[in-house]
A protein has these predicted regions:
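Core segments of cupin and vicinal oxygen chelate
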Residues: 11-49, 54
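Acetyl-CoA-dependent GNAT
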Residues: 34, 54-58, 100, 122-123
Length: 123
């Protein structure tokens, strides 16, 4: 029997791979690990990857996608600091301003393709 690993790849579909790669490089503040004309990978840590993909040679744009990209920081203070930093960056679209939820401080960002990115403190 094959041992199933923990999920280690988060992949989202994008409409403009180059624009999205630049966007996430700015957002994450580090360079991609792998770059191709249709697929870009950012190494999150030694195990997990975050990837963006155009959907292949003939991407299917009609498929709905329901998900949220999560960035967990250590403390509410870090969430507040990152919110201020990103709020000042004209290239980052704050979708929902900083607020307190059951898990602590959080805010939402939308990427160029409308994917929602939630920043919050670790549960």
């Amino acid at each position: 029997m094959i041992k199933i690993r923990k999920p280690n790849l988060q992949l989202i579909y994008v409409s403009d791979i180059q624009h999205s790669a630049e966007y996430y490089q700015n957002l994450f503040n580090f360079e991609p690990y792998f770059v191709s004309p249709r697929y870009v990978v950012f190494k999150v840590d030694g195990v997990a990857d975050f990837a963006i993909w155009s959907g292949g040679e003939s991407p299917e744009h009609e498929s709905p996608r329901f998900a949220e990209i999560g960035i967990n920081l250590e403390t509410d203070t870090e969430v507040k600091e990152l919110y201020k930093e990103w709020k000042a960056d004209a290239g980052i679209n704050i979708y929902k301003d900083l607020y307190t939820d059951v898990f602590g401080e959080t805010f939402l960002v939308k990427d160029p393709d409308g994917h929602v990115i939630r920043v919050s403190s670790a549960d």
